[in-house]
Amino acid sequence: MPEDALDNVTSSLHDVVVVGAGPSGASCAHWLADAGWDVVVVEKKSLPREKTCGDGLTPRAVRQLADMGLEPLVAAAGHRYEGLRAVGFGRELELSWPEHPNFPPYGYTITRFDLDAIIAESARQQGARVLYGTEAVEPFEAMPPVREGRLGSASGVTVRDVATGRTAEVRARYVVIADGANSRLGRTLGAARRRDWPMGMALRGYWRSPRHDDRFIESHIDIRDANGDVVPGYGWIFPLGDGRVNVGVGLLSTDRTWRGVNTTRLMDAFLAQADPSWELSESTCLGPATGGKLPMGLSVGPCLGDNVVLTGDAAGAINPFNGEGIAYGYETGRLAATSVATALERGDADALEGYSDRLSSSYGEYFRVARGFVRLISEPKVMQACVGVGMRSDWLMSRLLSIMANLLRPDDLGSAELGYRAINAIAKRVPDGALDAVLAALDDRAPAVASSRG
């Protein structure tokens, strides 16, 4: 980063400083800058850069990209696909994305190497100043929370030039924390993850494949070892359209054996059962797999302080149903931008309260249902009974896809919408912790559950 670039942003008070140029940070900066506010984005890495991800964009993400005017760029750099191929329990179903008044019936696959650079550049073109190679070290002039259930506040962030080690302060009226799943700034100001809520763990790599331009992304619901026994986890193969496929495995902390699972062995088991036509072998592998853990279901909080908001992965804004985070990064970044802009327009920080309300109304009930669902299907007997039976019906799995991808129609009480309402009505009456007792009763290893659960 040129030295004068840091000088230019440290000499004045800005409207907003956004920490992180990933999906939520770049989205927030795009919308704030588009509205004419003085925005500075600090990003530790230099974009483009590699980022561990499944590289899949659902119709929800495409809608946000279209609203930003960026779908043509993503379409040119990525690969369009039409739906999900579900594989499991001896069956294979091709499920097209549902027709929806607000979302397109297709998605894209595109590497985060390309995608994140497109969004960050868009924020810059809207007028945001984006400082690459600049690490946010700590909140500047941090103050403790004024009341329980709130984050602390800050007058900006102290940053460090990664290349030179020089430090400086970027001062701003509002601070948006979008620094990812391991949010250091969020923790410093009082954010913490609810450890009894789902945490995802995933591993992914790239392979050359003759099916790189397949029209469906593929999800494997059950993975089996060499003996045919079910092992905890799920797998995916996402065609990228450029000669490569993104291949990965995932696991949720709701599975009682997750701490003892070796993800490399899980990947090996998945590769062994993938259809040979994908040609996933040691000779077609393009490098070592990488992975990480992701908080889900808005499991991180508080998300709001006097002049601070948490957004995207930093807030745990990942769908527990399917592990999707990019769409919710764009959406929560936009929600944060709306709330911050309102506070700036009114000259009243109390207007920031709308952010919590917007998160709750947008995702509160849905993520609650999702948390209950993933708890249940982590029990093999429930998985066999529910998903195993569901795989016998294209009709049923198509409805389940609408629910899991959060693509329920607001204007129609169809079978998927009615099914979700019924599940939601039940979930409202069952406390999160109550499911643990039910699962323990189903588990032959019930006495060991309490001691193994974190």
Residue spans for each PLM region:
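N-terminal Rossmann-fold NAD(P) dinucleotide-binding loop
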Residues: 25-26
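C-terminal helical "tail/cap" subdomain of flavin- and related membrane-associated enzymes
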Residues: 341-454
